[in-house]
């Protein structure tokens, strides 16, 4: 999802966000990132990387000169997006609520333009009004408390700036539909995966996981503050375990893994314990 602020609403009163059926008190960061078994290094090693085509799409929407302005990366994790987009901006501020992630990002980054900070999207008090050109959030926006985040974002993004959120949900193994069904059962099945081994179904944090699996459709920018909203959604065919040729340009995330590496990827799931 990509959107731009309305020019006449940056400094004016903000409309309350309609939460619908969501209980704001249940919105939180991914609690899996603070569990004792979580490894920030493992997350960096086994999670997929975003391809240049995704960043080109975001920058084409943003339509701004390169190497100038400020980028704000929300839920930056190990700093993947901040490092990739740094050449396009004069300054990058990357935040994450997890201290372990911020520490890992700092270890992996040697770029004086990037500042990492432990903070949340709901409290951007360290960011000046109308000082940010582009806000991004990759695989993080389904955890935000938007009753607090939207007002903060409307405050810090300058007139003519942009916001881009994206994420990925349940992966498929190309060419292995039977394995994909096993993985589906392990993640969301109601029955035991094996004798004495339950699925991860009850361990996903809600409503965050549901928001992500529904392609962030529940993340709706307040129309009084944001305009020119665009959504790009790609859903692979899980039954055939394939990607149609006409969808190749939209299938942005690929990662080749050995079996042991795929296990490492599964261990980065917030619902995984063991």
Residue ranges of model-derived segments:
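N-terminal, positively charged/glycine-rich alpha-helical extensions of SAM-dependent methyltransferases
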Residues: 2-41
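Conserved alpha-helix/loop element of class I SAM-dependent methyltransferases that forms part
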Residues: 48-69
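Class I SAM-dependent methyltransferase SAM/SAH-binding core
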Residues: 70-124
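A short acidic, Gly/Pro-enriched loop at the edge of an enzyme's catalytic core
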Residues: 125-134
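A short SAM/SAH-binding and catalytic strip from SAM-dependent methyltransferases
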Residues: 133-147
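A short glycine-rich, Lys/Arg-flanked "PGG" loop and its adjoining helix->strand segment in the class I
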Residues: 148-159
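Conserved catalytic/acceptor-binding region of the Class I
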Residues: 160-255
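C-terminal lobe and adjacent flexible extensions of AdoMet/dcAdoMet transferase-like proteins
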Residues: 255-274
């Amino acid at each position: 999802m990509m959107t731009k602020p309305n020019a006449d609403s940056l400094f004016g009163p903000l409309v309350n966000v309609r939460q619908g059926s969501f209980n704001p008190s249940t919105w939180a960061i991914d609690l899996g990132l603070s569990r004792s078994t979580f490894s920030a290094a493992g997350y960096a090693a086994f999670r997929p990387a975003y391809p240049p085509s995704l960043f080109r799409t975001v920058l084409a929407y943003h339509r701004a000169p390169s190497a100038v302005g400020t980028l704000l990366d929300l839920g930056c994790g190990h700093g993947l997006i901040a490092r990739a987009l740094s050449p396009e901006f004069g300054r990058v501020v990357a935040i994450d609520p997890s201290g372990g992630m911020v520490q890992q990002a700092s270890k992996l980054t040697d770029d004086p333009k990037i500042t990492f900070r432990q903070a949340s999207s709901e409290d951007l008090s360290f960011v000046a009004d109308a000082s940010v050109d582009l806000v991004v959030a990759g695989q993080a926006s389904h955890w935000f408390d938007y009753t607090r985040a939207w007002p903060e974002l409307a405050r810090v993004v300058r007139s003519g700036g942009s916001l881009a959120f994206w994420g990925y949900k349940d992966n498929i193994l190309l060419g292995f539909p039977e394995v994909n069904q096993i993985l589906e059962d392990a993640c969301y099945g109601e029955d035991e995966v094996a004798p004495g081994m339950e699925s991860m179904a009850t361990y996903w944090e809600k409503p965050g996981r549901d928001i992500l699996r529904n392609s962030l459709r529940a993340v709706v920018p307040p129309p009084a503050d944001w305009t020119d909203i665009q959504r790009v959604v790609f859903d692979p065919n899980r039954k055939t375990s394939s990607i149609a040729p006409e969808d190749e340009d939209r299938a942005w995330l690929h990662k080749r893994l050995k079996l042991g590496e795929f296990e490492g990827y599964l261990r980065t799931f917030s619902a995984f314990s063991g």
